Amino acid sequence: MGGCIPFLKAARALCPRIMPPLLLLSAFIFLVSVLGGAPGHNPDRRTKMVSIHSLSELERLKLQETAYHELVARHFLSEFKPDRALPIDRPNTLDKWFLILRGQQRAVSHKTFGISLEEVLVNEFTRRKHLELTATMQVEEATGQAAGRRRGNVVRRVFGRIRRFFSRRRNEPTLPREFTRRGRRGAVSVDSLAELEDGALLLQTLQLSKISFPIGQRLLGSKRKMSLNPIAKQIPQVVEACCQFIEKHGLSAVGIFTLEYSVQRVRQLREEFDQGLDVVLDDNQNVHDVAALLKEFFRDMKDSLLPDDLYMSFLLTATLKPQDQLSALQLLVYLMPPCHSDTLERLLKALHKITENCEDSIGIDGQLVPGNRMTSTNLALVFGSALLKKGKFGKRESRKTKLGIDHYVASVNVVRAMIDNWDVLFQVPPHIQRQVAKRVWKSSPEALDFIRRRNLRKIQSARIKMEEDALLSDPVETSAEARAAVLAQSKPSDEGSSEEPAVPSGTARSHDDEEGAGNPPIPEQDRPLLRVPREKEAKTGVSYFFP
């Protein structure tokens, strides 16, 4: 506005009549640019908070860019680099050739404890694919009848593998492409293609599914193309199994995560997970042993669940007010890798359920149900140092930044706030949604249009499903009752009679409730027999946003 003052003075000196329109135009531009709209315009009314898992990979990238710039403006990122290196997809070349020269083959790793989270997911994915391939080969060998036919199948498989080996791309990573973050979700899925109304949009969709961006615009430095599909959740098997068992059997266990446990049974479970076995936690397991196993997984993990380069940024949120702390934690969660944020959400969900049962309550049968005595503060004391580990980046930041309070106390405060507000941390507020949409539109308007149309189809399908569920929950009256209701309304009653016409129960309604007092009543036969409750219509939980 300061640069417009000389122009307004010159315009006033030349022509005083144009001053009022210029002032109105300047005020309108100021409202649109600074406040985000004209007076009375509130875009938040039609926009709701959406889950971070409903965003596509492209939207997740723009969300990270938005969170990065927001945190930089608040001076929360000191050592975090936008172009930080990703985990290497290929193994060490020297180690690889050394094993080849020695005639040894690298065994498939099944380890789960004591390694990084990315390596845990890689091992699980590789083990699952190996089991599927082994089962397929066994089925093929079992279906062969004659020896010649089996010999032909073996020769065909060998030549097929040789052909695929020489025809593959040389720059293909060693890890499965479906797992690596660089090659994940490279095209539109079959479900997305099935949602298209006509085949004319097929080519456009395939082109939009592989949008490329300059390296300078990529927050995480990935060179591969982004997808318009959401990212699948990536949670280790041991975390999911332990959380499910605790939610089923441990909500009423007093002092969970703090009482003594059997070291031998925990070591046995740990060895089973490290061997790649399909471990099933049944009712015979002790809940304290499972809780200790979950705690050991995060404590012995090679990296920190909350990234090391964001260590000091998380601790700085402990010095803020509760509302400001929650907003800063949201932005920091957006910057986390998807596998870390998914695992953190699963853990916080289980811990929050434990805190909901910390106090004594009365059961359905009227008996007193003792609480587990584990509040969010007690759980934060247990998991504070396990989730926030100080690595080399954290040590460097701690020397540069003076926090003012002890790091352990700050970590407990941060973890407690995350447990209490776990459901809000992984939601995207409306004003962040608009910024993400603007960034997507600047990079590719066609991609934003495709995302809008897909979200609109999701809303329509959710409404149809809601109406079907409402019809199933509110069954239609039998034909005899409906016919009796119509006859009762159409039959004239005697003027001197004080008796009301016989109407089956459930058909008569108060006119003051629907038509309003003083208005003529609507005949019952004109009303539809099938009605969808309005309160159920607002519980779809599906939303989309516009810039």
Swiss-Prot record:
Residues the record marks as site: Arginine finger: T258
Q: In which tissues is it expressed?
A: Detected in the outer root sheath of hair follicles at the level of the stem cell bulge, during the anagen and telogen phases of hair growth (at protein level).
One of the protein's GO biological processes: signal transduction
Superkingdom: Eukaryota
PANTHER family in the record: RHO GTPASE-ACTIVATING PROTEIN 36, RHO-GTPASE-ACTIVATING PROTEIN 6 FAMILY MEMBER
Tell me which species this is from.
Homo sapiens
User: What UniProt keywords are attached to this protein's entry?
Assistant: GTPase activation, Hypotrichosis, Signal
What name is this protein filed under?
A: Rho GTPase-activating protein 36
**Does Signal show up as a keyword for this record?**
yes
Tagged with keyword Signal: yes
Q: Name one GO molecular function term.
A: GTPase activator activity
Q: Which stretches of sequence are listed as region Disordered?
A: 485-547
Stretches assigned to the Rho-GAP domain: 226-426
Task: List compositional bias (Basic and acidic residues) regions by residue number.
Answer: 524-539
